[in-house]
């Protein structure tokens, strides 16, 4: 037993040990002896039986009932379909049992429609009404067939009614009559039927279970959203209130963006809360049905869809996966394109798409098709005008399709055949081609070209272009493609449009004019011609620019790699390179979008092995589609819950895998995505949820006896925070009331625990992805403990950067909790509590002030600041500043006379190599951010936390300077492309350990990062401030410099003689080789060349008095902490922050120097006079080492706690 948690017993809600929780058992008051079994459901059943026998069965019944009902439903499913549930289907059933509505995003073959059809039968057998809405008549027929087949197999009868256009008149009349009178258990119609017949037939019907298959067709009439809500039991008044909330939230978002006053924000928040309470009351008083919206690739747009969020607690995602499992390759052609394609088809076999670049167009596509046909290949050309090839390909009557590589091309987007498409061939790099006068511009191409050439424009023009670009991008964000085409036509034909679209047209026109103007500038064209990523060509006397069309490449190659039930099919892409510069541009842009992207010459890959893997996946897909799923495929797709601390981290991770669907669970938002082999729900816990209590044991720690030895057990309860006064506490004085201000508006982390327990019951496994340090491990341990009884499997995942590859790797390498790290954190927290409480109470007694506090680490640090201040005040002296005729400045100390001239007494000049510094550790980053940017330690740590959570830099709490292979690759790519290959000098910088140095996660500098965010290529869940970019720039430059060759300078050291003594100066005369100084300034002054015995006239004299010793900045104090072994990367900033918060130290406004206050000086002197041995620097350093030893399993944490306890008894209690 390591700890006790109050109120966490899953049966009686009493106190329970960590051991009992981890063993998935109730507390020892409920069960005398723990029960253990391998099978989760058997364990739950056995525990229920034991609790019942003892007469203490309470909340455990809910865990049992849920699992039992799933088993029963699964039995029926097995009877009806012949299969057991997929893991994902089991999750969906659990949600339905709990009465939750949700959106299903699942790949092909996950049995969404089967599930919807089956659940409607289940509800019918319970005497409840179901309604299934599908997009088309054929699907109505198919669904009805499915339901009838299941009824027959399961030997059940329910009243099934359906309507579609192919019914005979008599059948139609009968169906309409039954619908009108509500004489049905299950109703199946198209979404068109719901839209047109709602008022006359469906408005007054109440539905218990509604299943919408294919959200896109359903949303064609956005009022279908209101219709579905009314059928589920909401009235028009409540829907209006939800609509009001949506509008208010939009206003609120605007206010927050403009950083408007608190009053308005408060007012809106109060109004939203009032409406939300009314909706909740309505839902409690009325029976509301369950809605499931299924979608493979839904792209739900518009505000109306948000009604589901406000009334049913979920948002529809898009399900569009951004996962690629593609082997990207290229060939530099040595013969004609046609011959290369012919050769490839012979090697690669059937199932290929062949894309012709847009500059070659449909004529070349026809020519290529005819050539391939003449060589005996079964191939068809597909275009917007002629799509019959698609059908032939689907029926496997042809083996290949040829089309033009454009973003909205028929075979670029309209093809989802994971079992047939094996590879894609590009007969040229997908590209945009523009004539310099921009004939027939389209909006996306104009944006693409602007994005590429803005960096070549003079600053004023660039700023104007950036504003125009941002405006046009913002305006078209929610405009569908067919409307954009109308705007483009209007520009081409010189027409006007109505309202908002005319405004868009005007901005589009300005953008086109801006580009035409820019492309007349000779200087700009020269820069384009020199650029390695764009192509400037003259064709038939006319100049053209070509830029890569990366969106089309992603879409087109993506046809070969689709998400299906069991993973992501492997695909192959081959580019025949027709333009090296555009190809370079394509690679660069792919790397910006996919950190893990790499492309190899086709000859370098093992083609036989790749084709084997491709065919193995196709076989799996066929089995899934034909319903012949072997059990092993079924187990491939698990439902999992990933828990991280912050909403930013959760959103960043979710966005790696497509546009997630969202659900509200209590105060938390859960994001859902499919990552191939997992249906992943991602949730933010909000960080620490538990802390030591204050009302039990010795300051929250029980002292027990075990085998004649003292044993310490901390008692934890959930953290509470008052929303009105901000006070944070653990123990209630009066339940639900803030002990400081009396407010009842108190947040309790218990709410988060309940929400997490609720979600935990839905999944097969839980993955805890808290920060990779002792603090993160302790949070993970708490989460593991309190969720354990609710889920069969819980694992810890650890990642040091938030990137897609790192997350996927972490999931594959999931481990158990590291108990040693937890022990170290337990010791740190208990020590902090004991010392803090004991010494603070002494301070309260002596100074009669309850705001005072003391801690072991902060005391020596306060001492340094007090001592430095003393030296500062005692060291005032005269200074004489001399500016010499060659602009050198020298300063003489303790002198106040006059000087006319000085001479060069000694001079040495030599060539010197200057090595770069290693990449940042936490302390070095805090020092530099303080020195160069004027940031406080807390501000820097918050910015670094954001950059880490948004996936831009690696974990920021580290004392390692080691660089991983991934880091070296990133540096290589950036330095080679942007500075020059000859500058790259890879360095590992030290041994590999648990952590890595702080570095960027991609080869993207600050200017490029700003551009990629502006262009929407990198989308972040929150906006970055100027300070974020400044810190990113500091980290980026320091890291890149650390991977570059040394700089070589002509170094000069000189001794200057004056009437008052000598002054030494050093610096460099010249740079011989710039090396890393290309990216970061040298840490030396530039000096003129000096000669021995040279006489130099003084041109200016300044005199002043000042202290010799300067005060510390936050950066200086942190450097000292590191040097003297006090504090750790996770505590540096907190220690300084505490001294400032307590008012022991203040920071000067302009120079940010630290000055102790009178209170601080008194507290320090009192503590040192009374408890010197307890708070000395030496003892603090020893303790830090002890905690490190606990973490490394070299010391027993109970023994360390005992030592601490004895020490406190000795020094304080006595």
Curated annotation (Swiss-Prot):
NCBIfam families: rgy (TIGR01054)
UniProt domain Helicase ATP-binding: residue ranges: 93-252
Main location: cytoplasm
Originating gene: rgy
Annotated residues for binding of ATP: 89, 106-113
Protein name (database record): Reverse gyrase
Zinc finger map (RG C-terminal-type): 719-748
Origin species: Pyrococcus furiosus (strain ATCC 43587 / DSM 3638 / JCM 8422 / Vc1)
Top-rank taxon: Archaea
InterPro entries listed in its UniProt record: DEAD/DEAH_box_helicase_dom, Helicase_ATP-bd, P-loop_NTPase, Reverse_gyrase, Topo_IA_2, Topo_IA_cen, Topo_IA_cen_sub1, Topo_IA_cen_sub3
Alphabetical GO biological process terms: DNA topological change
């Amino acid at each position: 037993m390591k700890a006790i948690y109050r109120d966490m017993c899953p049966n009686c809600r009493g106190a329970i040990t960590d051991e009992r929780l981890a063993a998935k058992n109730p507390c020892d008051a409920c069960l005398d002896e723990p029960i253990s079994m391998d099978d989760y459901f058997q364990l739950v059943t056995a525990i229920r039986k034991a609790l019942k026998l003892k007469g203490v069965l309470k909340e455990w019944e809910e865990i049992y009932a849920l699992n039992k009902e799933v088993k029963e439903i699964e039995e029926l499913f097995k009877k009806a379909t012949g299969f057991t549930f997929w893991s994902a289907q089991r999750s969906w059933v659990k949600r339905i049992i709990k009465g939750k509505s949700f959106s299903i995003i699942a790949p092909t073959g996950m049995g969404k429609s089967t599930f919807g059809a089956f659940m409607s039968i289940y509800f019918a057998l319970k005497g409840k009404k179901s309604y299934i809405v599908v997009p088309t008549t054929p699907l109505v027929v198919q669904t009805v067939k499915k339901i009838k087949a299941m009824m027959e197999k399961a030997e059940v009868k329910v009243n099934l009614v359906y309507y579609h256009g192919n019914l005979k008149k008599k059948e139609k009349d009968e169906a309409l009559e039954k619908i009108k009178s509500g004489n049905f258990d299950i109703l199946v119609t198209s979404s068109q039927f719901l839209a047109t017949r709602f008022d006359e037939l469906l408005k007054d019907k109440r539905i218990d279970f509604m299943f919408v298959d294919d959200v896109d067709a359903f949303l064609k009439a956005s009022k279908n959203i209101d219709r579905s809500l009314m059928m589920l039991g909401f009235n028009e008044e409540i829907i209006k209130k939800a609509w009001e909330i949506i509008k208010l939230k939009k206003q609120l978002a605007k206010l927050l963006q403009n950083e408007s006053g608190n009053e308005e924000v408060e007012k809106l928040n109060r109004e939203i809360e009032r409406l939300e309470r009314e909706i909740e009351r309505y839902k409690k008083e009325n029976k509301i049905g369950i809605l499931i919206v299924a979608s493979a690739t839904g792209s739900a747009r518009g505000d109306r869809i948000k009604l589901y969020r406000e009334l049913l607690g979920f948002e529809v995602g898009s399900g569009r996966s951004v996962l690629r499992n593609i082997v990207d390759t290229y060939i530099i052609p040595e013969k004609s394109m046609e011959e290369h394609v012919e050769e490839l088809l012979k090697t690669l076999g059937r199932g290929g798409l062949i894309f012709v670049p847009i500059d070659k167009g449909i004529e070349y596509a026809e020519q290529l098709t005819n050539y391939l046909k003449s060589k005996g290949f079964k191939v068809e050309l597909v275009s917007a005008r002629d799509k019959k090839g698609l059908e032939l390909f689907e029926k496997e009557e042809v083996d290949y399709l040829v089309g033009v590589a454009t973003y909205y091309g028929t075979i670029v987007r309209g093809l989802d055949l994971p079992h047939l498409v094996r590879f894609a061939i590009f007969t040229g790099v997908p590209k945009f081609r523009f004539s310099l006068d921009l004939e027939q511009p389209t909006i996306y191409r104009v944006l693409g070209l602007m994005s590429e050439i803005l960096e070549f424009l003079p600053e004023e023009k660039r700023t104007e272009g950036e504003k125009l670009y941002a405006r046009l991008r913002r305006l078209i964000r929610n405009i569908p493609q067919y409307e954009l085409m109308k705007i483009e036509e209007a520009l081409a034909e010189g027409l006007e449009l109505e309202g908002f679209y005319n405004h868009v047209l005007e901005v589009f026109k300005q953008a086109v004019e801006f580009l035409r103007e820019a492309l007349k500038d000779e200087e700009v064209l020269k820069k384009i011609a020199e650029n390695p990523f764009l192509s400037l060509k003259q064709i038939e006397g006319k100049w053209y620019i070509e830029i890569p069309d990366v969106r089309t490449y992603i879409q087109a190659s993506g046809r070969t790699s689709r998400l299906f039930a069991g993973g992501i099919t492997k695909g192959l892409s081959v580019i025949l390179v027709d333009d090296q510069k555009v190809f370079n541009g394509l690679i660069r842009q792919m790397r910006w979008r996919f950190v893990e992207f790499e492309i190899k010459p086709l000859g370098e890959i093992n083609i036989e092995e790749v084709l084997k893997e491709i065919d193995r996946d196709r076989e799996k897909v066929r089995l899934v589609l034909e319903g012949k799923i072997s059990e092993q495929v079924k187990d491939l797709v698990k439902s999992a819950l990933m828990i991280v601390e912050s909403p930013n981290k959760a959103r960043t991770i979710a966005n790696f895998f497509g546009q997630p669907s969202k659900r509200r669970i209590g105060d938390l938002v859960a994001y859902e995505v499919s990552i191939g082999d997992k249906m992943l729900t991602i949730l933010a816990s909000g960080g620490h949820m538990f802390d030591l209590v204050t009302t039990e044991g010795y300051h929250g720690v029980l002292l027990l006896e075990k085998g004649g030895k003292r044993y310490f057990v901390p008692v934890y309860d959930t953290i509470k925070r008052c929303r009105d006064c901000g006070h944070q506490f653990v123990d209630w004085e009066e339940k639900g009331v803030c002990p400081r201000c009396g407010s009842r508006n108190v947040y309790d982390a218990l709410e988060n625990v309940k929400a997490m327990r609720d979600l935990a019951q839905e999944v097969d496994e839980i993955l805890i992805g808290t920060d990779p340090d002792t603090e993160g491990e302790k949070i993970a341990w708490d989460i593991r403990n309190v969720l354990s009884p609710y889920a069969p499997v819980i694992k810890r995942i650890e990642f040091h950067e938030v990137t897609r590859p790192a997350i996927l790797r972490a999931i594959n390498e999931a481990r158990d909790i590291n108990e040693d790290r937890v022990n170290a954190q337990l010791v740190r927290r208990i020590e902090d509590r004991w010392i803090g409480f004991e010494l603070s109470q002494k301070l309260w007694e002596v100074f009669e002030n309850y705001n005072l506090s003391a801690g072991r680490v902060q005391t020596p640090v306060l001492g340094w600041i007090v001592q430095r201040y003393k030296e500062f005040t005692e060291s005032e002296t005269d200074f004489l500043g001399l500016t010499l005729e060659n602009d050198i400045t020298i300063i003489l100390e303790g002198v106040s006379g006059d000087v006319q001239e000085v001479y060069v007494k000694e001079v040495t000049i030599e060539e010197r190599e200057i090595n770069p510094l290693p990449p940042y550790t936490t302390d070095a980053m805090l020092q530099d951010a303080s020195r160069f940017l004027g940031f406080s330690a807390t501000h820097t740590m918050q910015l670094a936390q954001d950059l880490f959570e948004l996936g831009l830099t690696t974990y920021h709490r580290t004392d390692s300077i080691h660089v991983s292979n991934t880091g070296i690759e990133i540096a290589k790519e950036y330095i080679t492309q942007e500075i020059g290959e000859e500058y790259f000098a890879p360095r590992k910088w030290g041994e590999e350990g648990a952590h890595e140095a702080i570095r960027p996660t991609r080869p993207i500098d600050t200017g490029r990062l700003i551009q990629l965010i502006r262009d929407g290529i990198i989308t972040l869940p929150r906006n970055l401030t100027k300070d974020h970019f400044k810190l990113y720039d500091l980290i980026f430059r320091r890291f890149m410099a650390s991977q570059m060759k040394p700089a070589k300078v002509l170094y000069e050291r000189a001794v200057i003689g004056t009437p008052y003594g000598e002054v030494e100066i050093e610096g460099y005369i010249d740079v011989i080789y710039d090396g890393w100084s290309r990216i970061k300034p040298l840490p030396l002054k530039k000096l003129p060349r000096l000669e021995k015995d040279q006489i130099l006239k003084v041109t200016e004299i300044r005199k002043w008095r000042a202290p010799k010793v300067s005060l510390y900045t936050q950066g200086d104090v942190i450097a000292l902490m590191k040097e003297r072994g006090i504090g750790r990367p996770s505590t540096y900033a907190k220690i300084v922050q505490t001294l400032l918060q307590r008012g022991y130290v203040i920071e000067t406004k302009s120079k940010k120097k630290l000055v102790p206050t009178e209170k601080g000086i008194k507290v320090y002197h009192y503590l040192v006079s009374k408890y010197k041995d307890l708070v000395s620097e030496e003892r603090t350093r020893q303790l830090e080492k002890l905690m490190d030893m606990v973490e490394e399993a070299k010391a027993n944490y109970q023994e360390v706690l005992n030592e601490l306890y004895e020490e406190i008894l000795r020094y304080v209690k006595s």
